[in-house]
Amino acid sequence: LRLEAGETMNALEFLAQFKATDGKVDLGKNVVVIGGGNTAMDTARAAKRNAGVEKVSLVYRRTKRYMPADEEELVMAIDDGVEFAELLAPVKLENGELICRKMQLGDYDASGRRGVVETEEIVKIAADTVIAAVGEKVPGAFYEANGIAVDEKKRPVVDHNTLETSVKG
């Protein structure tokens, strides 16, 4: 994710640091996570538990209804107190604020989700740290190349009792 100004932290790098420091990553009081998938939910929930963090906002350009995250992940983030800032597209980070452009829902796209259309409205969110959790993909091609059956989301198919994949041995 590129902003006009300011830097973001990568979600997977944050999660690794969170684990390595037992939740003591230096993030400041206000954290903003950008994204709407499972990685964004995990990142927001971890940030909420991180030492010194008071508020975690999750920014997404559509509404919760169109987030690709599993419903269970979304519910857990809500239960943990993550605040959702819907219909916002991040533009830049400056002076401790993430500047976002307000969006509105448009027509349905090929994936069945509503597209978004920019408006002229600007929204500012307090942000000491911005973590980008966009574009994280499960390496489905790797699984398939190694003979592991995958589901429609390119996740390995496993036996629910043994957690074995389709590969013998």
Predicted region positions:
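A conserved short coil-to-beta-strand element within the FAD-binding core of flavoproteins
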Residues: 87-97, 102-107
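Short, glycine-/Ser/Thr-/acidic-enriched flexible segments
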Residues: 38-39, 63-64, 91, 103-105, ...
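Short amphipathic alpha-helical segments
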Residues: 1-3, 44-46, 70-71, 142-146
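Rossmann-like dinucleotide-binding cores of NAD(P)H-dependent redox enzymes
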Residues: 16, 44-92
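Rossmann-like NAD(P)H-binding beta-loop-alpha module
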Residues: 22-53
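FAD-site-proximal beta/loop scaffold in flavoenzymes
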Residues: 6-28, 108-169
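General small-molecule cofactor/ligand-binding pocket signal
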Residues: 9, 83-85, 99
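Short, hinge-like loop/turn segments at secondary-structure boundaries
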Residues: 5, 73-76, 102
